[in-house]
Structures are given as structure tokens and as C-alpha cells.
């Protein structure tokens, strides 16, 4: 709630700084508690939860201080008529949907080890496979999204202002550029994770299985990043109710598919369910965004960025790799980034992510017109 206030008040930098400090403090406090916690799984869980709780309390106190500071010197005034009814009309369905989604997520967490065990794996092996995905693959997969979340925090007040001022042309321009930039960032990152999955997992976890699973999930990163971006833009356009409705639908679909596929196909059923549910969620959210903003769907940018990632990935994988994982990581990462960046500039794909007023061709055309 306090974070939403700072976002609406245009104090995104403060919010970002508090969030970064909270994460650092959470890590530091958890490490301190781990040193004094009793040995075993219970002590480790206590240390992690305790560090998270203390860091969250500190962040909430700082955010409340910013909230009080923002209202200092402002005389209280009466609320507009009907404001309470409007807030209840918005908050009630959001709260109910959140409760339903929480219940569905809990059911999903219970279904996964049960379904893996039903597929023939022992309880220990089932939990180990699930832990590899959630504890090793997903953190690496979602780490680059931190840059995207910072962009989303800046987008929400900008889109809300465009909507309130009825600036349809500006709204369409911002939405179009953000979708193109998200495509470029998502395809680059997904391809990079696919290329570096093996050496990265060896360096971080010393696990070949984690590398195989990371390479399997790497292409899905494009959908995950774009889904987060589209959800953020829908929030800026006051489409929270539709957003929560789509999330609830896909959570229910997730549970149904897990119940049917997990006992029969094991981890493969989980992978299929994860990909299918997120694709459905992204398709519904993107359809809503295009309808609200009036934009027309175009597959040209998506095809171009996909070809860039495939070409750069092929060049990196065909490059002879030296023995050590660190050297392979650096060499193939450099080849991939160089080929992708060069191809994006030569093909003009990178220029499409820049506003028209800032494009070199547009500036040159205006300069010729002035002459």
C-alpha cells in the first residue's frame, strides 16, 4: 500500500532505493541469523524467515516515514463524494481474487510433490527435482527481470497520467515503444540464458541437471518478461480487475493441468503446465492491453527479435569453447552479445525501440525539410 502511494506520487526513485536496501538487508540479516541458528533444516528456515521479516519491517517503517513527510504542511480536506464507494468497488474484487489465488497457489504447491511421486519417483527424488527447478533454475531465470521491474515502476504513473489527461496518441506511443523494448530485451536475455545454461549452472551449482532444465526454460523467459511488462502497463491503465481475473483463471488452469498431467508425465507434465499457463495469461493480458490502448497487433517485431536471438545463439554455440566453465561463459557470452547487437543495429531492429523523434533517420529527414 505504501509502495503504491509512492508510485502514484511520482517518488519511484525513493521506492526503488528502499526496495534495493530491503533486499540487501534481508540477505545480511539472514546470514547473521544463520550463524547463531541451531543446525538443521529448522534453524535455516528460521534464519531465512527472520531476516525477511526484519528487513520487511524496516522497509515498512521507512516507507511510512516518506508517507508522513509527503503530507507534512498539507491541510486536510474532505474526501470527494462517493470516494469510499469507488474504493470498495475496486478493492473488494481485488481482495477476493487474491484470496482465491492464494488458495490455488497453496493447492498447486501440494499437488506438485504428490504428482511427481505418483509418476513413479520416490518422495525424496520428487522433492529434489522440484527443488532444482524452483531453487536453482527460476532464480537465474528471473534475475534479469529486475531491470524490467524498475521500468514498470516508472511506467505506471506515466500511463496513468496519459489516461487521466486523455492523451491517446501519447499513450499508444509509450505502449508501442515499451512493447518493442521488452521484446528486444526479452529475446536477448532468453537467447543468452539458452547459450550459457550449461557453464552457468556448473559455476553456480555444479549441477548438470540444473543446466539442462535452465536451457529448457530459457525460451520461456521471453514470455515471462513480457507478461510482467504487460501486467504493469495494465495497472497503470486502471485495469487491475481484469489483470487479477486473468491471473485467477490461469491459476485455476494451472491446478487442473497439474492434477491431470503430473501423475502421468512427471516433471514433463509440470514443464508443460508451467509454459501453457503463462502463455494463456500473457495472451489474455496482451489482448486486453491492445484493446484498451487501441493498438493493432503486429508480428513483425517479434519475428525479427526471434531471428536475432536464434542467429546469435547459433554463432555462440558453434564457437569452440575452452575447457574451464568461466572461460566458456565469457567467450560465448561475448560472441552472443556482439552478434546480437551488431545484427540488431544493421537490421534496424534496435532503432524501432527508440521513439520516432529520437531516431537518426527521423532527425535527418527533419533537417532536410528545414533546409
Residue ranges and their predicted role:
Residues 34-38, 99-144, 161, 201-205:
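Helix-terminus/linker motif at the lipid-water interface of multi-pass membrane proteins
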Residues 17-32, 37-69, 249-253, 267-288, ...:
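Hydrophobic alpha-helical transmembrane segments
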Residues 230-238, 286-300:
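Alpha-helical transmembrane segments
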Residues 45, 60-99, 166-169, 291-306, ...:
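Interhelical loop/hinge segments that connect adjacent transmembrane helices in multipass membrane
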Residues 1-17, 219-249, 260:
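Membrane-interface junctions at transmembrane-helix termini in multi-pass inner-membrane proteins
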Residues 141-166:
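Helix-loop junctions and terminal segments of transmembrane helices
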Residues 319-371:
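Membrane-proximal transmembrane or re-entrant/amphipathic helices at the cytosolic face
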Residues 172-223, 255-256:
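Alpha-helical transmembrane segments of multi-pass membrane transport and lipid-handling proteins
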Amino acid at each position: 500500500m505504501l509502495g503504491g502511494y509512492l508510485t502514484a506520487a511520482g517518488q519511484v526513485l525513493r521506492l526503488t532505493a528502499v526496495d534495493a536496501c530491503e533486499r540487501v538487508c534481508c540477505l545480511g540479516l539472514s546470514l547473521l541469523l544463520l550463524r547463531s541458528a541451531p543446525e538443521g533444516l529448522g534453524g535455516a528456515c528460521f534464519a531465512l524467515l527472520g531476516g525477511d521479516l526484519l528487513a520487511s519491517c524496516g522497509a515498512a517503517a521507512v516507507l511510512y516515514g516518506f508517507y508522513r513527510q509527503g503530507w507534512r504542511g498539507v491541510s486536510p480536506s474532505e474526501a470527494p463524494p462517493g470516494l469510499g464507494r469507488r474504493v470498495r468497488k475496486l478493492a473488494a474484487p481485488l481482495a477476493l481474487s487474491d484470496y482465491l489465488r492464494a488458495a490455488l497457489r497453496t493447492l498447486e504447491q501440494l499437488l506438485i510433490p504428490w504428482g511427481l511421486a505418483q509418476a513413479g519417483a520416490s518422495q525424496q527424488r520428487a522433492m529434489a527435482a522440484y527443488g532444482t527447478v524452483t531453487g536453482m533454475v527460476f532464480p537465474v531465470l528471473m534475475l534479469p527481470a529486475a531491470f524490467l521491474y524498475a521500468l514498470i515502476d516508472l511506467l505506471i504513473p506515466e500511463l496513468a497520467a496519459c489516461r487521466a489527461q486523455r492523451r491517446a496518441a501519447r499513450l499508444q506511443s509509450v505502449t508501442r515503444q515499451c512493447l518493442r523494448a521488452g521484446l528486444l530485451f526479452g529475446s536477448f536475455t532468453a537467447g543468452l540464458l539458452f547459450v550459457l545454461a550449461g557453464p552457468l549452472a556448473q559455476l553456480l551449482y555444479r549441477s548438470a541437471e540444473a543446466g539442462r532444465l535452465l536451457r529448457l526454460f530459457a525460451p520461456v523467459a521471453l514470455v515471462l518478461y513480457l507478461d510482467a511488462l504487460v501486467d504493469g502497463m495494465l495497472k497503470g491503465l486502471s485495469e487491475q480487475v481484469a489483470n487479477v481475473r486473468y491471473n485467477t483463471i490461469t491459476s485455476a488452469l494451472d491446478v487442473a493441468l497439474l492434477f491431470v498431467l503430473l501423475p502421468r508425465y512427471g516433471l514433463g507434465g509440470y514443464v508443460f503446465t508451467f509454459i501453457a499457463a503463462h502463455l494463456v495469461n500473457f495472451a489474455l493480458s496482451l489482448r486486453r492491453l491492445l484493446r484498451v490502448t487501441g493498438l493493432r497487433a503486429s508480428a513483425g517485431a517479434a519475428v525479427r527479435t526471434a531471428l536475432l536471438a536464434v542467429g546469435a545463439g547459433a554463432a555462440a554455440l558453434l564457437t569452440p569453447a575452452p575447457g574451464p566453465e568461466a572461460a566458456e561463459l565469457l567467450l560465448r557470452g561475448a560472441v552472443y552479445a556482439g552478434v546480437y547487437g551488431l545484427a540488431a543495429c544493421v537490421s534496424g531492429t534496435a532503432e524501432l525501440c527508440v521513439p520516432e523523434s529520437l531516431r537518426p533517420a527521423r532527425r535527418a529527414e527533419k533537417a532536410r525539410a528545414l533546409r
